[in-house]
Amino acid sequence: MHDTILKSKVFLDHIAIESTNPKKIAEFYSKNLMMKKKCVSNIEWHCFGPNRLLIFKKGINNKLSCAAFGCKSERKLNKIRKRVLSEKIKIKEYSSIYLEKSSFSIYDPDNNKIVFGVPLKRWSKKNKYHAPLQHLTLQSLNVKKIIDFYHKKLGFAISDRVINENGVITTCFFRSNKEHHSLACFKAKNVGIDHHSYEVGKWKLIRDWCDYISKRGLTLFWGPGRHGPGNNLFVFFEDCDGNKIELSAELELIKNRKFLDWPHDARTLNLWGKSYLRV
């Protein structure tokens, strides 16, 4: 029962982010990440592409409205629900046009809303720029309490940790399937979203994506580089609200290994060069 999430092969299905101008940010993703946009109401826009779905709601810029994790059967979802209830975590039924009616939501120690459900079938036609939404990274004042919640209570597996010279965990990477992480958390001065990431597959596709967004006037603020934990290649850029977006390639696939501890230094975050340290 300890690795309930991992054994259920959970994946990040979609995220919802608040914005003072949902229409504007939806137009950004439609133009620059080749996602179709849909106006749901005057305060909510949806963007979707092959295996990537984002929801933008009227609110405070850069605030996570929710992160929705999917699994492929009601049986697996029921196991997760049972695990959550056994930990005495309060559950609320969750309604979404993208998930089966059995979906539910909970809140983590930083008051981030986390949803679990079985995704309904939707458009997933691949093209040259296939880039599924792959992981969400959070910021927290206290990474340990995030570990206690997601690992000990929910059953995400730990892939890697980053520890500073005082023995404090500054970063933790959680996996819910064979991919190195579908969720991570950095120790920071703020609480909320750090970044979200799309897995493009191969290194040459990062090149193609960078050429594509460059033609639209965007510039990278970090990368190209290679992370230590996960060993993936990456680039980062920002959307019109300042949300950080990662394009990743060749993320480590883990069959069965114990987590590794990495030092809190620049080379851990980028084996190739300059780093982006949160604290």
Give the label of every model feature segment.
Residues 53-55, 90-93, 159-160, 182-184, ...:
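A short linear hydrophobic-aromatic micro-motif
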Residues 25, 29-30, 84, 111, ...:
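Conserved active-site tyrosine of GNAT-family acetyltransferases
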Residues 1-23, 64-69, 121-145, 157-159, ...:
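N-terminal beta-strand motif that seeds the catalytic metal site of vicinal oxygen chelate
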Residues 7-52, 98, 102, 138-181:
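Core segments of cupin and vicinal oxygen chelate
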Residues 33-66, 112-120, 161-194, 200-203, ...:
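Conserved short beta-strand elements that form part of the metal-binding/catalytic scaffold
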Residues 1-5, 11-20, 59-132, 137, 171-174, ...:
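Vicinal oxygen chelate
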